[in-house]
Amino acid sequence: MKKSTPAPSAVPLWRQQLHYRLKEGALIAFGALCLYLMMALLTYDQSDPGWSHTSSNAAQVQNAAGRAGAFCADILFMILGYFAYIFPLLLAIKAWQVFRHRHEPWQWSGWLFSWRLIGLVFLILAGAALAHIHFHFSAGFPGSAGGVLGEVLGDLAKKALNIQGSTLLFIALFLFGLTVFTDLSWFKVMDVTGKITLDLFELFQGAANRWWTARAERKQMVAQLREVDMRVNDVVAPVAPDRREQAKARERLVEREASLSKHMTEREKHVPAVIAPAPSKPVEPSKRVMKEKQAPLFVDSAVEGTLPPISILDPAEKKQLNYSPESLAAVGHLLEIKLKEFGVEVSVDSIHPGPVITRYEIQPAAGVKVSRISNLAKDLARSLAVTSVRVVEVIPGKTTVGIEIPNEDRQIVRFSEVLSTPEYDNAKSPVTLALGHDIGGKPVITDLAKMPHLLVAGTTGSGKSVGVNAMILSILFKSGPEDAKLIMIDPKMLELSIYEGIPHLLCPVVTDMKDAANALRWSVAEMERRYKLMAKMGVRNLSGFNQKVKEAQDAGEPLADPLYKRESIHDEAPLLSKLPTIVVVVDEFADMMMIVGKKVEELIARIAQKARAAGIHLILATQRPSVDVITGLIKANIPTRMAFQVSSKIDSRTIIDQGGAEQLLGHGDMLYMPPGTSLPIRVHGAFVSDEEVHRVVEAWKLRGSPDYNDDILAGVEEPGSGFDGGSGEGSEDSESDALYDEAVKFVLESRRASISAVQRKLKIGYNRAARMIEAMEMAGVVTSMNTNGSREVLAPGPVRD
């Protein structure tokens, strides 16, 4: 395998720390200077000694900043006039800018500094001139209202442009200088002002609407009470009852009026549902994205040993809120009404809008069972005129029940949007998976090494293949071929074949199921080899093994392979190197189970049971989640599941052991059940187009070529190795094999009827050795397999002289 060249060296840590300390020092210096100048200006006294005049009482200084402060204030007032008060505020603005960008490295630019200095000069000159033109002279200052600068510039401008023209000129120069010096965007100021105005308008409008609605309801109630009174009077008057009956009727009317009044009071005091705020600004990009933006040449430079930039993916669209708090509250009120029509009394507690669905958390009344609400899911979907409604019976840490209703306008979650988050960038695992966003729009990042295997299921069109592509690309954007290796099995010959040629592949993309069985068998053998290596090294997992190998290499004493068997004295054991994490991806698991059958299930079960510490992980995907495909043996060893949209509740229970997947929306909408929990998380999967996949594959092809291991698929390439469907038996006679007699001789001499022993002795594949042992069993040379998996040799050994 080709060794990758090291990545470009990063900025030294001491230089980064120096940049941060310089910024902190500049912040402290700016802040102290601002406070000192403001204190000197506010406590200025003309009797203090100064630059523009002398003082008879030089020994006593009234200025709080001392003699130096008195001189500074006198100079600033002499030159700038009233504008001297603005000068410390400008320094405070620069201190605030240094504080905002304190986590970014220090970057000196002479051109940018000169540009900021020009803006400051324009700002000071224009401000002083405006102060001279529009303010009167004060006896307490050493100069005019605009100082020496303002007086000179103001008089010149008034002679040429008059007061109005001079004012317009200096206002324009003042705004220009303010923009250049503070990097202020007036368009952004207008946007913020407009947003605040609209928010205030919506607030007042909502309050007015609530007051008007309450007033109308009160009028309606009063009218109903009057109508009831009239009907009672019409009924009671002709009969002329006695005084006791009249008193009882009046008491009933008073009680009814009091009940209605109490109902109206409770309705007015009803706390409205809390609407969770949507993210007003996009997620802060990660350090990797900022680094790629600062180095645009990095996009086109395909250097071996580097990772492709995230910028080759399609950028995310700008998120626009397609709802208002009033519309969400209206749907919540409608939900309460519909549930009340079905005899379930609830109140909406909070509303959580998201990119695809909105979750309404409701508080059931006392005595209402959650099962009653769950059984009304289809009726609610019909009543609310939506495609489906999902009921979340248990929300951890809350007493509410979740009702998830799809949004009218669904937002697309771009894959680049998830990869650009700090959560993905800070993940250390080489098999980090970026799945998408949760219902609140937050990224969902998980680690395949902790799962340690994943079962994915969903019908056609549910987004299953796109989800598998997103998982593979997550690994390709996180790890190089020295950290992660892939074995891809693609029975459909369409989905995973586009990854052919990337350097992460251990073997070509497997499309023949005979090769798939051999690839899984090689994975089991590699798992056993790694466990033996780790046992010899005294470590418990792959990360500990790699750490020990790295420490030995750094110390200049690389470790030799302890499992190497020397054939001669002169042979030297090869040196140990870092072992990559291996991910086996099967796109259509059901098709492989139909063709290969029981043997593959046993191999998958062995990998799922033991391969976590060895760094071998499985991703099994199928569009037919039936019990004959996802068997109990596989489900018991793969606790992490991912269910896309399925056709029935039975299929949902087959995948995640509970319903809910049949109510998903498709197109990437999934239920992800992390390991160690039985509560699934609803995730909106990230969308990856075919063009993006091709761009990533081409980027990796430019960075290196694959180094295939021929031993992975060699088992089916042995001469005379037929393959017959799911049984795995050869179609030709095993006794006609050229090595059959030699195999019988070895078994009789060693008295060991083991497939692995014959395989090692004759250096042949597993299938061929198994057929020879089965032929010996049929010929009566060995017995059938015992309960412990061993065989006994029946035929006598060769006669020795």
UniProtKB/Swiss-Prot annotation:
PROSITE patterns hit by this protein: FTSK
Complex formation: Homohexamer. Forms a ring that surrounds DNA.
PANTHER family in alphabetical order: DNA TRANSLOCASE FTSK, SPORULATION PROTEIN RELATED
S-S bridge residues: none
Compartment annotation: Cell inner membrane
Database matches in Pfam families: FtsK_4TM, FtsK_alpha, FtsK_gamma, FtsK_SpoIIIE
Keyword Amino-acid biosynthesis: no
Cellular component GO terms, alphabetical: plasma membrane
Keyword Secreted: no
Major localization listed first in the record, in broad terms: membrane
Protein purpose: Essential cell division protein that coordinates cell division and chromosome segregation. The N-terminus is involved in assembly of the cell-division machinery. The C-terminus functions as a DNA motor that moves dsDNA in an ATP-dependent manner towards the dif recombination site, which is located within the replication terminus region. Translocation stops specifically at Xer-dif sites, where FtsK interacts with the Xer recombinase, allowing activation of chromosome unlinking by recombination. FtsK orienting polar sequences (KOPS) guide the direction of DNA translocation.
GO biological process terms on file: cell division; chromosome segregation
Keywords tagged on the record: ATP-binding, Cell cycle, Cell division, Cell inner membrane, Cell membrane, Chromosome partition, DNA-binding, Membrane, Nucleotide-binding, Transmembrane, Transmembrane helix
Protein family according to the UniProt entry: Belongs to the FtsK/SpoIIIE/SftA family.
Membrane topology of the entry: Multi-pass membrane protein
Region (Disordered): 715-736
GO molecular function, one term: ATP binding
Transmembrane segments: 24-44, 73-93, 117-137, 167-187
Amino acids binding ATP: 461-466
Domain topic, free-text comment: Consists of an N-terminal domain, which is sufficient for the localization to the septal ring and is required for cell division, followed by a linker domain, and a C-terminal domain, which forms the translocation motor involved in chromosome segregation. The C-terminal domain can be further subdivided into alpha, beta and gamma subdomains. The alpha and beta subdomains multimerise to produce a hexameric ring, contain the nucleotide binding motif and form the DNA pump.
Protein name as it appears in the record: DNA translocase FtsK
Residue ranges annotated for the FtsK domain, each copy included: 441-653
Gene name, Swiss-Prot/TrEMBL: ftsK
